[in-house]
């Protein structure tokens, strides 16, 4: 879908990749920008910068998500592109116990990384299907294709986000609604413990939010289901599929390196 002239709604857009996406959409000629974030002040600041509307929203609350979509439709008449981007960061890694996360942590990860996408898609799909046009983007993670060593709940729920996007593409891809799942790896955000002002290329394998947003926008305009901000992830994913046992052994070696205090670096 070409972004020019569209109305885009982005969740988790008060900062990070979400905010960078709003800026990227505006640069590409979007007619309307709807910024939703748990931090309403940040959402309003981004919206003011871009001439859009900013709304506070807890993406785990289905009624709140519907309210944001209703506000977008009241202002612009429709939502053409939904980027369901809100997410939680990886917790402190537990390299020895894959089941150490509390039930509350599991539920929170599930609510944000899976059900938030469900709530958002349910809210915008009726209008898209009625018009026979629209685009859904779930922002997951490379961990949804591979795994995040030491954080099982994060990995499992990001896999769930990928699976949901697959089901959406199967159900609606021939009804005028495009679907993508974005699976970024290392991006300089507060969620990954890095500063958004990190210069491009200053850390091996780490992208700026602007680079990630540009790659995601390119994927939307090229109607690509799987959007990889880090192309090397495709090779890792193919290696996993071709020899699962070998891949698991490699991930154990990654775990051992992390246990020894090594920083996992990805070649750009």
Outline where the language-model segments fall.
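Canonical Rossmann dinucleotide-binding motif of NAD(H)/NADP(H)-dependent dehydrogenases/reductases
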Residues: 2-33
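The beta1-alpha1 cofactor-binding region of Rossmann-like NAD(H)/NADP(H)-dependent oxidoreductases
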Residues: 40-41, 57-68, 103
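Catalytic Tyr-X3-Lys loop
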Residues: 88, 99-118, 133, 137, ...
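Active-site helix of classical SDR
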Residues: 121, 157
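Residue(s) in the substrate-gating loop at a strand-loop-helix junction
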Residues: 141
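C-terminal helical subdomain
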Residues: 181, 197-236
